[in-house]
Amino acid sequence: MSLITIINPLTYIVPILIAVAFLTLTERKILGYMQLRKGPNITGPYGLLQPIADGLKLFIKEPVRPLNTSPILLILSPVLALTMAMLIWTPIPMPYTLANLNLGFLSILAISSMAVNSILWAGWASNSKYALIGSLRAVAQTISYEVTLGIILLSILILTGGFTMQLLTATQKHIWLLATSWPLMMMWFISTLAETNRAPFDLTEGESELVSGFNVEYAGGPFALFFLAEYANIISMNLLTCILFINPGPTQHPELFLINLITKTMILTLTFLWIRASYPRFRYDQLMHLLWKQFLPLTMALCLLHVSLLISISGLPPLT
């Protein structure tokens, strides 16, 4: 094994983890200012060292394991969650991909649906009724919203004519897909909120009824891994939204592409935080009704429109 095979993944993983650490600080600061308070401001200048202090505190704590839990699955679940969250980043161009996959988008969907297993295992291995209910909620919610994500993705890929990220940037050279497919963009964005278990869809962490959800028995290091995975998923989903609908620019200028991509992703991520501060939590039946009775019929109709549009204007997408 050469040194480059170790350095390559590390140069990808370490910046993601640093971004995740400071996203937690940004969230706490934004929520603080929206609630007319300061947020973290003691550790370091303006509280900038808070995520480092939090991370150190969590990882040096003694790992506590309740007596009746399943020890292997209990440790395996957070590790799997973080591994899946990191794997999603491999086909994403920044501006070059870590693995140039032909079916980049399909692999991202497959990996994100595999990440559900870690939540299910965590709830089951904890041997707690609250954790199990939380994990079952998370699984039902994630699997449900993946249906609309898949159909929206299919609609966009029909316009593009291929599964690679590079084709998408070429398709959006003259006009963003946001301008032509804004209903899909709105439904995609709301579905990503549900997919990442964020407010107002954070039913898995319903504090009033489930204490903390599927991670109720976790503390210290394993809890930190779940936390990192959740925020890494938020950033990766927003990156995807940016590539799909708000073209990050041509890949001929790597520096401009990266700056453009990061700026737009930051705006989308701040919107996630703004939504968390503004909206109350959905009821579970409202969450399911929104998907199965509103989003699904609408996305299927729009998918048919995207298919028929190409034929009706006598133009086929660039087939690769």
Curated annotation (Swiss-Prot):
GO molecular function terms attached to this record: NADH dehydrogenase (ubiquinone) activity
Domain of life: Eukaryota
Keywords from the named record: Electron transport, Membrane, Mitochondrion, Mitochondrion inner membrane, NAD, Respiratory chain, Translocase, Transmembrane, Transmembrane helix, Transport, Ubiquinone
One Gene Ontology term, aspect cellular component: mitochondrial inner membrane
Tagged with keyword Transmembrane: yes
GO biological process: one example: aerobic respiration
Membrane topology: Multi-pass membrane protein
Broad EC category: translocase
Membrane-spanning residues: 3-23, 72-92, 103-123, 147-167, 174-194, 226-246, 255-275, 295-315
EC number: 7.1.1.2
Alphabetical list of InterPro entries matching this protein: NADH_UbQ_OxRdtase_su1/FPO (IPR001694), NADH_UbQ_OxRdtase_su1_CS (IPR018086)
Subcellular location: Mitochondrion inner membrane
Reaction(s) catalysed (UniProt annotation): a ubiquinone + NADH + 5 H(+)(in) = a ubiquinol + NAD(+) + 4 H(+)(out)
Sequence similarity: Belongs to the complex I subunit 1 family.
Function: Core subunit of the mitochondrial membrane respiratory chain NADH dehydrogenase (Complex I) that is believed to belong to the minimal assembly required for catalysis. Complex I functions in the transfer of electrons from NADH to the respiratory chain. The immediate electron acceptor for the enzyme is believed to be ubiquinone.
HAMAP family per the UniProt record, alphabetical: NDH1_NuoH (MF_01350)
PANTHER family per record: NADH DEHYDROGENASE SUBUNIT 1, NADH-UBIQUINONE OXIDOREDUCTASE CHAIN 1
Protein name (Swiss-Prot/TrEMBL): NADH-ubiquinone oxidoreductase chain 1
